[in-house]
């Protein structure tokens, strides 16, 4: 493990729903126990993979409290709490902190495409409103705009509780700049399972992973092997699971991973609109891969 606060293998946790689309807290507790047993370092509920845009603030609070109660002090809980309206993002962050989150993952403002100064002011307002560590989530493919390395580094230097970035830009030049120029206590994590091996080899601190929902032990071993320079071992793990990493995005996340978890008997296959079940052909492809890995 890195000496930085935010590091290792973090799971971007799904939100299990019952058939009536209400939150299934029984399944949620079982998922938390699954990750404790697997050695996952951080659980992140209420993020993109947790269908956060469809959750009410009351549901966000209940999910975070449930995860925190089940996790206790065995595993860090860093909750998703972001949106594109700054005042609402502040409200979500304060709500997550009150519910017991030990850190907050806050997605960059989306759709309205603010300038870099606007992005800076957005995160500055959040940092001033809460005391827990904040993870910036940069995912241009979903938000429509990139948080520049210079903006991330400025925030990291100006605010002690801006502790990390989940970098999902696939921009290796930006990742390199962040790793080389960051403050000593600032963590850089990848949001791409397919990039864990090269990212860790470059000096990254960990991953916020979708595949960790299905194979948490494997993701943990991959991160640790790559971090400690056991590259042959890391390559072997990566080779075994890289097709699963890719198939988790055969359609929009979290649809494939929730289908997989349903096949594994861990949750019901229920989504909230506008997400809908996988196409039949994609179900067949993903199921075959899960069978080849011995997961179903």
From Swiss-Prot:
Residues that coordinate or bind pyruvate: 49, 208
Molecular-function GO terms, alphabetical: 4-hydroxy-tetrahydrodipicolinate synthase activity
Catalysed reactions listed for this entry: L-aspartate 4-semialdehyde + pyruvate = (2S,4S)-4-hydroxy-2,3,4,5-tetrahydrodipicolinate + H2O + H(+)
Keyword Methyltransferase appears in the UniProt entry: no
GO biological process: diaminopimelate biosynthetic process; lysine biosynthetic process via diaminopimelate
Site, Part of a proton relay during catalysis: residue positions: 48, 111
PANTHER family named among the record's database cross-references: 4-HYDROXY-2-OXOGLUTARATE ALDOLASE, MITOCHONDRIAL, DIHYDRODIPICOLINATE SYNTHASE
Protein family membership: Belongs to the DapA family.
Task of the protein: Catalyzes the condensation of (S)-aspartate-beta-semialdehyde [(S)-ASA] and pyruvate to 4-hydroxy-tetrahydrodipicolinate (HTPA).
Protein name stated in the entry: 4-hydroxy-tetrahydrodipicolinate synthase
Organism: Chlorobium limicola (strain DSM 245 / NBRC 103803 / 6330)
